[in-house]
Amino acid sequence: MKKILVYIFLLLITNAHSEVTKKITLVAKVNNFGISNIDLLEEIQILKNLNTNLNNTDKQILEKIAIQNLIDEVLKRQEIDENDIKLSDSTFSKEYEQLIASIEKTGVIIDANIKKKIFLKVKLNNEWNQLINKKYRWNVNVNINEIEDRLKDTKNIPTDEKELQELKNKLINIEKNKKLEVFSKIHLSKIKKQSLIKFF
């Protein structure tokens, strides 16, 4: 009798495992790197966690956004690895913790697997920004005269020289980041055109 029960138990486990295996399918391939339906479901969950307004978004629209995100991430990761860009976890751990705290503040419960995925996203974004900065920082020019003019139009300009310089540096960094964001989109678009992307 015990042998029969053990056999039935093993059979159930095998069938359950088989069902799970069957459910994993490829939805896209990027330069021989596969993106599965599980990756897609997790990405949709992350999108909903990061922006609760997306909970009411049409499923097909969400899937399109999610698959595009996943493709972009694969391309970014391949480019980062190719250029040997590496950042220590401590570089972005505070940013990650603040992001998780802001999500959980809305009442969203994030499971450990999704937290890990969000951590990897934050890491990827920081390493990608490092790559773009390294490649294009010499192409980024900020017109200081425009910054000076903008400061003149600003209400409550600091009278303290140190505070004024800090504000000026902040505005310069905002402009630099805007221009680097443009280069980021151009660079991603360029590598996307050179890549083999297949949908299933």
Where are these regions (language model features)?
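Sec-dependent N-terminal signal peptides
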Residues: 4-13
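Boundary at the C-terminal end of the N-terminal hydrophobic targeting segment
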Residues: 16-20
